[in-house]
Amino acid sequence: DWPRTWLYMDRHDSAGDNAEPLYRYARTHAPSVRHIFVIERTCPDWDRLAQDGFVLLDPTGPGFDAAWAGAETIILSDIGDPLIKDRLNSAGTGTDQRVVFLQHGVTMRDMWRWFNGTRLDVVVCATAPEQAGLTADHTSYTLTDREVWRTGFPRHDHLHSLLGRERDSILLAPTWDPEVSRALE
């Protein structure tokens, strides 16, 4: 029998997306919850996270199936990760579990086939137009305001916490925008 557990994962082979800073925040602000970060043992981020006190679990090793099944909340930055995507669309995730999709960035393209075909109880978004685009009537999305939470992204909050402590510049590289990418070439 598992204690109240939240399972976090950016990607099976890397950290540094939205799940990592949310884990850092939640382990301080939700101390009664057991926090587990999922990442492969062979990943270069493993040692860095271990030194920072993360409770780590290799998704290819023993104990992962039990941790997934026992987690109250599963918090993911990438719902398409090959090691977990099938679990979201099958009996691999219980109806009593909550699946939170942190996303990687603002949804700008029509992703309804991917979103609608995946078990998502909460989708985190960053902007009002994004939230409206995901929840409005007469769109292809089946999401509602109940599932889509406009909270911003944890890694952006982490950047804000660095103000005045480290570098004071941020370089924006909109590589997701083909028009801007072509203009920069």
Language-model segments: which ranges?
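Conserved donor-binding/catalytic core segment of Leloir-type glycosyltransferases
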Residues: 6-8, 165-184
